[in-house]
């Protein structure tokens, strides 16, 4: 189906699903003619009464995209966040130009008092090591973490050319940010490559994740659809990833680039990100 470009300034709510807050209310976020806006409405699609103010909604930037054709993701997490309050986690573009891709958690409010208890958290702005032109395909919460799945330009391949890798990123729900100037950035953000390939001496890679699925009855497995690059030999595959294997990678060694012309290599010893409850 083709979309008439003349219709793109209209408001779209399709990039993100509706999230039920309770039996009667929904959280929605839309592009709002390239000016993202979020709101809470009744499940029958009518507005809340004036006395039913919901703190923290109105500005949808970094929560949903400017462009309805962007590949974005979001998940409403009800438990495990700082202060025990619900929060929206999202992966999208925070600027109209798409220069600022972000994994984001909005300000956290106490809905009983309307008071902001915790400020937003996000990936470091304009840092291609964090995110490099990502296309998000999904997000899930499991235990203490929220996981994001996406494909992006592979920064570790830059010295050899340009290619796309698939990723899984993880943040801790309890994350309250770094120190000093990094207080609004994630302190627990990690990402790793997802490898979907036909094994052998010369593996054949399906580098571009297209969709992700986790069974509602099983928090230990993810199933993903991958494809080859659109300019190469066309192919697709379904690969499954066990959560224990994912966590083993996140607990393992990091890669680093010693100089701008060096290869990316594992650091000498493992570094760990510890959640403080």
Describe the function of each predicted region:
Residues 1-277:
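Disulfide-stabilized extracellular ectodomains of secreted/luminal proteins, especially beta-rich
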């Amino acid at each position: 189906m083709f979309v008439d470009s003349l219709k793109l300034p209209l408001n779209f709510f399709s990039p993100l699903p509706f999230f039920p807050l309770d039996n009667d209310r929904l959280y929605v976020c839309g592009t709002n003619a390239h000016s993202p806006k979020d709101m809470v409405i009744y499940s029958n699609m009518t507005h809340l009464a004036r006395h039913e103010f919901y703190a923290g909604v109105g500005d949808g930037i970094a929560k949903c995209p400017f462009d309805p054709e962007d590949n974005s993701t979001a998940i409403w997490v009800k438990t495990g966040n700082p202060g025990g309050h619900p929060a929206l986690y999202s992966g999208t573009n925070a600027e109209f130009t798409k220069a600022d891709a972000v994994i984001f958690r909005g300000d956290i409010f106490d809905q009983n008092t309307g008071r902001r208890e915790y400020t937003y958290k996000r990936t470091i702005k304009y840092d291609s090591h964090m995110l490099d032109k990502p296309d998000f395909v999904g997000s899930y919460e499991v235990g203490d973490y929220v996981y994001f799945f996406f494909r992006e330009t592979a920064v570790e391949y830059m010295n050899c050319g340009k290619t796309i890798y698939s990723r899984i990123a993880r943040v801790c729900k309890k994350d309250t940010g770094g120190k000093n100037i990094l207080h609004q950035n994630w302190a627990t953000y990690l990402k790793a490559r997802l490898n979907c390939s036909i094994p052998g001496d010369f593996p054949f890679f399906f580098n571009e994740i297209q969709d992700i699925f986790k069974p509602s009855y099983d928090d230990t497995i993810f199933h993903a659809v991958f494809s080859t690059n659109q300019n190469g030999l066309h192919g697709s595959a379904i690969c499954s990833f066990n959560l224990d294997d994912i966590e083993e990678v996140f607990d393992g060694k990091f890669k680093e680039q010693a100089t701008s012309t060096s290869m990316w290599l594992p650091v000498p010893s493992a570094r760990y990100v510890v959640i403080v409850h």
